[in-house]
């Protein structure tokens, strides 16, 4: 059944609304649906429906699962540099295999693709070269719209909206190389809890989701940081004081 734009979006018609979102070229209609989907940012079922729809239409490549992604949700509005991309590059330099998934900025000034472009690192789509990069350099960058054409269809409207949307929660769940390890920063407790639920449902071997108590979607040097970490199928919660890190500065 085709979704009608004047119909309230519910959990039960979310699939039809999402299908229409990616089929229509009407920016106003796209914005209306995205704003309604934002009401379900803390609903794991709706997030999974959106994720699965985007994945279904993706460009599939052979997985390189023994890798780590540092893709976070972004959108904390604090105008920091792109820390997740910086961390990815640093980790790869000490031989941690990094499959960094990312996109251009939608609600900030420095998306991962913006940073990678400035560094003249090529965003690959070719499966052979992606795997060669992982073996040789321990790093490859995965530009989301190359693999997920549906994300390209909403790039313009997301830029017009200029605030964090439900799509901020998609990147960390859609690594094209199937990275089985994830470190993920997000903005607050509720975001961390919902991302923990989502990552638990997509069969990662291990992950750590964290938020800082000052609103930073990274580990803060100025306030405590709470972690939700999965190891051996168990999820543990731990809060670490910023003073722990400050003693190393």
Predicted features along the sequence, with ranges:
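Acidic, glycine-rich active-site loops and adjacent beta-strand->loop/helix elements
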Residues: 72-77, 102-108, 147, 213-214
């Amino acid at each position: 059944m085709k979704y009608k734009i004047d119909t309230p979006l519910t959990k039960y018609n979310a699939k039809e609304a999402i299908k229409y979102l990616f089929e229509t070229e009407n920016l106003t209609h796209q914005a209306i649906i995205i704003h309604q989907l934002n009401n379900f940012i803390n609903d794991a079922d709706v997030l999974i429906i959106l994720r699965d729809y985007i994945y279904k239409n993706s460009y599939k490549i052979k997985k390189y699962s023994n890798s780590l992604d540092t893709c976070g949700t972004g959108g904390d509005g604090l105008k920091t540099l792109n820390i997740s991309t910086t961390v990815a590059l640093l980790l790869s330099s000490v031989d941690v295999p990094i499959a960094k998934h990312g996109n251009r900025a939608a609600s900030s000034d420095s998306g991962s693709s913006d940073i990678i472009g400035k560094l003249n690192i090529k965003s690959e789509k070719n499966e052979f070269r992606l795997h060669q990069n992982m073996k040789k350099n321990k790093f490859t960058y995965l530009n989301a719209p190359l693999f997920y054409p549906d994300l390209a269809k909403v790039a313009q409207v997301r830029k017009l909206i200029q605030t964090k949307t439900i799509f901020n929660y998609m990147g960390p769940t859609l690594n094209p190389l199937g990275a089985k390890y994830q470190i993920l920063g997000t903005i607050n407790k509720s975001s961390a809890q919902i991302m923990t639920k989502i990552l638990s449902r997509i069969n990662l071997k291990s992950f750590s989701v964290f938020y800082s108590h000052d609103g930073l979607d990274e580990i803060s040097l100025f306030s405590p940081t709470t972690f939700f970490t999965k190891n051996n199928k168990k999820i543990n919660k731990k809060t670490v004081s910023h003073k722990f890190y400050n003693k190393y500065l």
